Amino acid sequence: MSLTINNDSAIGFALNALRRSSSLMNEAMERLSTGKRINRASDDPAGIHRVIRLNAEIRGINTASRNAADGQSLVDTLDTSLSEVQSILLRMRELTIQAMSDTNSADDRLALDSELSQLELEITRIGSTTSFGGKPVFDGNTHYLQIGPRSGNTLEVQSYTLSAATLGLNQDLTSRGNAENYLGIIDTAIQNINEKRGAAGALSNRLDFIMSSLDNSKVNLSLIHI
């Protein structure tokens, strides 16, 4: 008894085997090129859930890193404005010391007071116009930075209002007594700004550490073999 094989069936079997072999080869090449064992759900239906979780974690970390970088830029903007105010206060202190001398005439003191008034206005202008991302920086509100991939990974940044009035700068230099009183007020304002700049510097350092930690977490997750 002889066995007869239909030519069409033989060709079909051969083509299917060739397609399967080609598909396996393509999958192997894809794994080599991507360095990943799982590139699609069919590669490992159970393992794909782990891949999705890891990818979500990495993408969340990437977003958190951008948020932290934005926070760093916000702090830089704030500190730049405080530095300007600090310079203005030092100039105001010079004017006040000059006005304390009785060698000044009444007109001299009026001229000194006029410059002082303009500097007070400039401090208020800086406080009201400094912004980041279209939002005011010195608004007295609490700003939240999402610095991690999970709920609760937030950093609170407490803002404050900044103006000549909030710094207590409301004295004139039309008399020696006024100038003498104002010197103490200005020194207090300078100390206030120094403390705010110190806090900004500490926050900037913390954000640096946060960004470094996020980068390390991303690298560690990327090394997980999937």
How would you name each of these model-derived features?
Residues 1-224:
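Primary detection of the long, small/polar-rich alpha-helical "axial" segments characteristic
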